[in-house]
A protein has these predicted regions:
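P-loop NTPase switch/communication element
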Residues: 53-70
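Short glycine/serine/threonine-rich phosphate/pyrophosphate-binding segments
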Residues: 24, 28-32, 56-57, 101-106
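Walker A (P-loop) phosphate-binding motif
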Residues: 3-41
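Short beta-strand-centered segment that lines the nucleotide-binding/catalytic pocket of NTP-utilizing
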Residues: 41-54
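Conserved catalytic-core segment of NTP-binding enzymes
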Residues: 1-14, 74-86, 91-193
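Peripheral docking tails and interdomain loops at the edges
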Residues: 180, 188-217
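A structural signal for small-residue-enriched, beta-sheet-centric alpha/beta enzyme cores
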Residues: 47-49, 64-66, 98-99
């Protein structure tokens, strides 16, 4: 097991964290689709998995977050991301989120922000969901509040919103996308229906920053 030691600053790949507004909302699926989209675009991309399923699905650089003693969580996240960078020098590393920052039972995400230090965050959201999954009476915090919480804690921007379209028909999906963009100013994508190419393009400003960083040999903003 590893303690956090700051070597995350050596990682010059674009780091994208896929977080969510709830548990069981589609973060891992979106993360895989984003990896595939970057690869299709000719980029070397890897997923750092944080749960059992991503590990079973073949994410080479993974950790099982809920099996760790708390003292080692940050260090193991850092080690997984750093090892991913050292092993293949990918252009992009996508970090799979767990739970959600404001979830009363599974308050995941802070560790990824603190130790993984993503350059940008993608927020997965189920527009039709009103309560936290499995906890009736616990109203889901609204999307702008959850975005503000992530940005305040991380000092990084949420660059896009991805939609879990449960309980929405085609018209409802398009209405939800338009409402999210109007409310947050962010592009919204249903990657399960349309793939993640558009999401990949929306993240291009951060990718270009990472390319410039590698070209100049300068470490990231935390280095």
């Amino acid at each position: 097991l590893h303690f956090f030691d700051g070597r995350i600053a050596q990682v010059q790949a674009l780091k994208v964290a896929v977080l969510g507004t709830d548990s069981a909302v589609g973060k891992r699926t979106t993360a895989w689709l984003l990896v595939d989209a970057f690869r299709t675009a000719g980029r070397r991309a890897e997923l750092v998995g944080t749960g059992q399923t991503a590990w079973l699905q073949g994410a080479r650089h993974s950790l099982i977050l809920d099996s760790l003693i708390n003292d080692f969580v940050s260090g193991e996240i850092e080690h997984a991301v750093w090892s991913c960078w050292e092993d293949g020098r990918p252009d992009v590393i996508v970090l799979e989120g767990q739970g959600s920052l404001l979830n009363p039972a599974y308050p995941g995400g802070f560790e990824l922000l603190a130790a993984g230090r993503p350059d940008v965050v993608v927020m997965q959201h189920a527009p039709a969901r009103r309560e936290y999954d499995g906890f009736p009476g616990n109203r889901l915090h609204d999307l702008p509040t959850q975005i503000r919480a992530v940005e305040l804690i991380s000092g990084r921007r949420v660059g896009a919103v991805t939609i879990n379209h449960e309980d929405l028909d085609a018209a409802g999906i398009e209405a939800a996308r338009a409402a999210i963009t109007a409310e947050t100013g962010l592009p919204a994508f249903d990657v399960l229906r349309e793939g993640a190419d558009g999401l990949c393009r929306a993240l291009s400003p951060w990718l270009h920053e990472a390319d410039a960083r590698r070209g100049s040999g300068v470490a990231g903003r935390d280095g």
